[in-house]
Amino acid sequence: MFLASADGEKVVYSSYQPFPQSKNGVGTQPYLSSRTGAGWETIAMGSTTLSPNPSTFDRVNAYDSTDDFSTFLMDTSAVLSPLDQDAQEIFPGFTLFYQDTYKQSVGAPPELVSRASDDVPATGPFTASYAGRSDDASKVLFQTGEPLTPEADPIPPFARYLYVREANGTTLVNVDEGGAMIGECGATLGDNWLAGKGATNAVSSDGQRIFFRVPDEEPRVAAGGGPLPPGCEVPPQVYMRDGDAVMNVSASQMETPDPIVAGAVFEAATGDGSRVFFTSGDRLTDDATPGGGLYAYDVDSEVLSFLSTGATGPGGAEVDGVVRSTDDGSHVYFIAKGQLDGSKGVAGGENLYLWTPGSVRFVTTLAAADVQEVGGEGLTGVAELREARITSDGSTLLILSRADLTDYEAEGTVQAYLWDEDGEMVCVSCDPSGDPPTGKATLRSKRGSAFGAEYQHDSRNLLDDGRVFFETTAALVKRDVNGTLDVYTYVPGGAAQLLTDGKAKYGSSFFDASADGRDVLVATQASLVPQDIDNGENDIYDVRLGGGFHPPAQSSCAGEACQGDPSSQPAAAEVGSATVNVPGSKDGGRRLLSSVSGRVDGYSVTVRARVAEAGVLSASGPGLSRARKSVKKGGAYKLKLSLERAAKKRLLAKGQLEIRIKVRFAPAEGSAVTRTTIARFRCGKKCTNADGRVQG
């Protein structure tokens, strides 16, 4: 788990080399570093192992945490509780302990989650894995093949039960209101992580509503295409547990239901659990096209809706799956091979669409290699597509693709693209000179263990103001000379800027960022400050607006001995505000006016600006009309400026015209902030109409 808190003041990460704070001294362990006035203070998560034969296999994998970083969820084979006794003696003198799920709050000992309701030690052997939680972690879900409650009937090998652990004990989730277990082949929270889909809001914020799939997918994976155990061959269905009530949300609501053949795949739910999105190859509503597609079930009204409308071909929508959705369910990005927005898109291609209430909008067509089938169903496989990001309101999408989504010829290399609801698509990682690509883009190469990746929080590569953080091996600026991975940032209307030094032999990678972009965490082997004297070990730096700490007194250490003192590792002062600052900003890092972009259309230009609070937004430029707007709250706003008569004459005479636009924001309190951008107008051969673009 690699993650920064929303305010950038806390960072959690893992290290296979033990720090002095480590209580085990062996195996990978998570650490929590908190920023103080004097530096970073670090604690190790996970108490001293009680195993009689501790080893490097006793790794502690932190997969999740509450938003305030007060509680962590971990899987480990290390023995962190006296109740953890699911062991097996392999040979005399060596006892193997199996993986269990733990919950640990800062300052408290770890609590064994994967156990029965009583406090009798589990003697196993059995393996458990973390599945999900409520926002406050008062309810934690885990999966295991071990029957821990009376309702847990026998299931086939590799199948797993789904349990929820809370203060009053452990409960089987996949059980109906009469107390009978649902299905004969276990259950999965949300959907299988091998399919490349995480359990997006499969547990509501309060933990009251839990979405799960029956049967469990593990027996199918283990069978490898061979015959399935009894009870595992049935089409999967999506269920919801709401307190003691359980319902099949993917059940057909057709007046005369068709036979269920394909089954359903959970895609996402809203944060409060009021709506769930799933895909199915079956027609489940009377208005659904052949082959089914994307559906939404409203919990309160108990109404099932077909969302992937508009297909006219015989194959219907042919939905592959959901890429991203907002927490409130107002925006859902999904892939479909059908043409759902008139003639837009490519029939049979990997078309990306945006669903909003009442409409399906075509975004772009991705490369076939961007969408890959693994395990036989749904949007699966490739990490590039799963790494997509959206803003909290869903208006902006950041995606990786091998396709040429702009005029730039990427020659099949993976590049990062930014799309917004105005229809503008920008390649943020492409070579600004237009030369052929010399490298590929990634969003976060350091993801930690592949196991449990579905639980890992998305890194903040896309901020709500449109700023982007990405990695690339290409040199997008002259001072990037190492020929390997470096971290860049992109501000809408501007150009990519290098955040790391561009000189580190083994490159640098993006770790995470704070929600406001003030702190950008990067990992590098380069020594960016004098205090980093560990001879090239991988370190985490905070590239921070306002800089870091004053250098402490020199300590005498070398090599790995210095690795154990992260509390003295400062933020990267020399790479701080000078690199991250928005070009043209004079707000001292407050980011009152965080981004400016626009579009030329004929003889006018529409400027978009994002502001942080209430105030007056204005724009002007020589030869342009002035525009002014009072705004009552922070957000994105548009101002339209038109060419004056004299400027039109110059454009018609010369064929092109460049005007620098000054955008000014005056907050209700405090000093005004200004940004500039350049609008380039051009006209055709006859100069009877004009077109152009805006460049920051």
Show where each model-derived region lies.
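Conserved "turn/edge" positions that cap or connect secondary-structure elements
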Residues: 1-588
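Short acidic, gly/pro-rich beta-turn/loop elements at beta-sheet edges
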Residues: 438, 550, 617-619, 649-651, ...
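Glycine-rich loops and low-complexity Gly/Arg-rich segments
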Residues: 452, 521-523, 546-547, 652-655, ...
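Short glycine/proline/serine/threonine-rich loop/turn segments at secondary-structure transition edges
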Residues: 531-533, 647-658
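Extracellular glycosylation-rich, acidic/polar low-complexity regions of adhesion-
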Residues: 588-629, 656-696
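Short strand-edge motifs at loop-to-beta-strand transitions and within beta-strands
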Residues: 635-639
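Short edge beta-strand/strand-turn motifs with a hydrophobic/aromatic core
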Residues: 640-645
